[in-house]
C-alpha cells in the first residue's frame, strides 16, 4: 500500500498537467502562508493598540527576527531540493540521510540564535534608537523569540519534509495550527486576559514561541504518520559532512539573501529614524500588510521548487518550462491585486494599526509609492526560486545583492538627502526595476545551462 501511494505521488509530480499540479501543490501552502500573514498582522495590530512605540520596537527587532527565520527557511530550501532530487532519482537511502541531517541542523541553528539573543539583543536594538521605551520593548521581544527559536526550526523543517514528498496539505495544517494558536494566545499575554499579567511586547514574544511549539509538534506528528517516503532512523541523524555541504551549497545563498534583506531593513530603519520614529512604524506596518500578498507568492514558490527539482532529476525539460510560465503568471496576478488595494485604499489598510494623524500622513503616500513595484517583484521572486531549484542559488544571491545593496539602500540614502521622508519610498520601485533586469539575465543563463546538461545526458 505504501509503495502504491509513493508511486502515485511520483507519477503526479512527473505526469500531471503542470498548471493543475502547481495549483494542487501550491494552493495549500499559499493558504497556510495567508494564515501566517494574518498572524503577522494580528500580532502587530494587538501590539499597536498598546502604543506606537511598541509597533516601532517590533519594526526594529524585525531584521534580527528575519535572520532567525531565514536561517531555517534557507536550510529548508537545501533540504527540500535535495529530497526532491533524491526521490526523483529513486534514491530513498540518500533521502533518509538528508532528512536525518536536517534535524541535526535544526539544533545547530537554534544554538546560534539563542547565543545571539542572550548576549547581543540589547546592543542590536540600541544601535537603531536611543529612545529608551522603544529600546526596552524591542530588547524583551527579541530576546524571547531567539531563545525560544528551537520550535520554529523544527516546525519549518517538518513542513519542508512534507512539502518535498507532495504532502502540501499536511504542511499547511501544521503551519496553520501554529499560527492560529499564536493568534489566539496573543491577547491573553499582551493585554493580560483571564488573570494573566499584561506583558505587551514580552507577551507577544511568549505567544509566538508557544504557537511555534504547537506547529512543530503538529509537523512531527504528520510526518511520522503520513510521510512514508522518508523514514528517519537515529543513524540518519549522524552529521554527514558531504550532505550538510550539499544542503548549504543550495540553501546558503538563500540564507545570505535573507541576511542581506535584514541588513537592508536595519539600514532603512536607521535612515527613517533620522526623520521620525513614526516613519519606522509605517515601514513596519507596510511589511505586515504586504505579507498578505507576498507570502502567498512565497507559498507558490514552495510548490514550484519541488516540481522543478523532481523533473530536473527526471530529465523532463518541457515540464520545467511550463511550470515556470504558470508560476510567473500566477505570481503576477496575486501581486497585481495587492497593487490595486494599496493604490485604492491605503488609509483603510493602515486603520488596522490604530494610526495617529501623523502616521496616516506619512503612511498613505508611502503605501501608494512602494506598491508600484509589486508586479515586477512577482517575476523576480519566481525567477529566483527557479534558479535555486536548478542548483544555481548563487544567481539568486547575486540578484538580491544587486537589488538591495547596489540599488535600494543607495537610492534610499540619496532620496533622504532631499529632506522629505515621502521621497525615500521611491527607492523600492527603482530597486525592483534593476532587480528585474538582473533576474532576467541570470535566469536565462540557468535555463541555458540546464538545457545543455539535459541534452548531454540524453546522448
What are these regions (language model features)?
Residues 1-26, 83-150, 196-252, 308-373, ...:
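Short alpha-helical transmembrane segments in multi-pass integral membrane proteins
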Residues 19-38, 42, 64-71, 147, ...:
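Residue-level signal for short hydrophobic patches within transmembrane helices
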Residues 34, 38-56, 125-132, 188-199, ...:
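Helix-terminus/linker motif at the lipid-water interface of multi-pass membrane proteins
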Residues 55-115, 152-171, 269, 282-340, ...:
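Small-residue-rich hydrophobic transmembrane alpha-helices
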Residues 76, 145-163, 171-179, 204-217, ...:
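Short runs within selected transmembrane alpha-helices of multi-pass transporters and secretion channels
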Residues 31, 43-47, 58, 83, ...:
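Hydrophobic/aromatic residues within transmembrane alpha-helices of membrane transport systems
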Residues 24-43, 144, 178, 211-215, ...:
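Transmembrane helical elements of multi-pass membrane transporters/channels
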Residues 52-63, 138, 142, 205, ...:
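Small-residue hotspots at the loop-to-helix junctions and early N-terminal turns
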Amino acid at each position: 500500500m505504501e509503495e502504491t501511494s509513493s508511486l502515485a505521488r511520483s507519477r503526479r509530480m512527473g505526469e500531471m498537467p503542470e498548471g493543475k499540479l502547481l495549483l494542487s501543490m501550491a494552493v495549500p501552502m499559499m493558504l497556510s502562508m495567508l494564515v501566517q500573514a494574518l498572524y503577522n498582522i494580528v500580532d502587530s495590530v494587538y501590539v499597536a493598540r498598546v502604543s506606537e512605540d511598541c509597533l516601532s520596537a517590533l519594526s526594529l527587532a524585525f531584521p534580527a527576527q528575519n535572520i532567525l527565520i531565514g536561517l531555517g527557511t534557507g536550510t529548508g530550501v537545501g533540504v527540500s531540493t535535495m529530497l526532491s532530487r533524491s526521490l526523483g532519482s529513486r534514491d530513498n537511502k540518500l533521502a533518509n540521510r538528508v532528512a536525518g541531517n536536517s534535524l541535526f541542523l535544526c539544533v545547530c541553528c537554534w544554538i546560534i540564535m539563542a547565543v545571539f539573543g542572550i548576549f547581543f539583543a540589547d546592543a542590536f536594538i540600541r544601535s537603531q534608537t536611543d529612545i529608551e521605551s522603544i529600546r526596552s520593548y524591542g530588547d524583551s521581544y527579541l530576546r524571547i523569540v531567539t531563545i525560544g527559536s528551537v520550535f520554529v526550526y523544527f516546525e519549518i523543517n517538518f513542513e519542508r519534509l512534507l512539502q518535498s514528498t507532495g504532502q502540501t496539505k499536511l504542511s499547511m495544517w501544521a503551519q496553520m495550527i501554529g499560527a492560529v494558536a499564536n493568534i489566539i494566545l496573543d491577547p491573553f499575554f499582551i493585554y493580560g486576559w483571564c488573570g494573566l499579567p499584561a506583558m505587551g511586547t514580552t507577551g507577544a514574544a511568549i505567544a509566538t514561541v508557544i504557537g511555534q511549539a504547537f506547529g512543530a509538534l503538529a509537523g512531527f506528528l504528520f510526518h511520522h504518520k503520513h510521510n512514508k517516503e522518508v523514514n528517519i532512523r537515529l543513524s540518519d541523524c549522524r552529521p554527514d559532512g558531504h550532505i550538510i555541504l550539499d544542503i548549504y551549497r543550495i540553501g546558503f545563498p538563500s540564507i545570505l539573501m535573507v541576511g542581506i534583506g535584514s541588513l537592508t531593513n536595519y539600514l532603512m530603519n536607521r535612515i527613517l529614524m533620522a526623520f521620525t520614529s513614526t516613519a519606522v512604524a509605517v515601514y513596519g506596518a507596510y511589511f505586515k500588510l504586504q505579507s498578505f500578498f507576498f507570502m502567498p507568492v512565497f507559498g507558490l514558490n514552495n510548490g514550484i521548487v519541488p516540481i522543478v527539482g523532481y523533473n530536473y532529476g527526471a530529465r523532463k525539460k518541457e515540464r520545467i518550462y511550463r511550470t515556470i510560465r504558470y508560476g510567473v503568471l500566477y505570481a503576477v496576478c496575486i501581486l497585481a491585486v495587492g497593487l490595486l488595494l494599496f493604490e485604492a485604499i491605503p488609509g483603510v489598510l493602515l486603520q488596522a494599526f490604530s494610526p495617529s494623524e501623523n502616521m496616516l500622513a506619512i503612511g498613505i503616500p508611502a503605501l501608494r509609492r512602494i506598491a508600484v513595484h509589486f508586479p515586477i517583484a512577482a517575476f523576480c521572486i519566481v525567477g529566483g526560486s527557479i534558479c535555486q531549484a536548478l542548483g544555481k542559488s548563487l544567481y539568486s544571491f547575486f540578484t538580491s545583492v544587486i537589488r538591495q545593496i547596489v540599488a535600494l539602500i543607495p537610492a534610499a540614502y540619496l532620496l533622504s538627502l532631499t529632506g522629505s521622508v515621502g521621497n525615500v519610498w521611491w527607492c523600492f520601485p527603482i530597486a525592483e526595476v534593476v532587480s528585474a533586469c538582473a533576474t532576467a539575465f541570470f535566469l536565462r543563463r540557468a535555463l541555458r545551462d540546464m538545457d545543455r546538461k539535459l541534452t548531454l545526458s540524453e546522448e
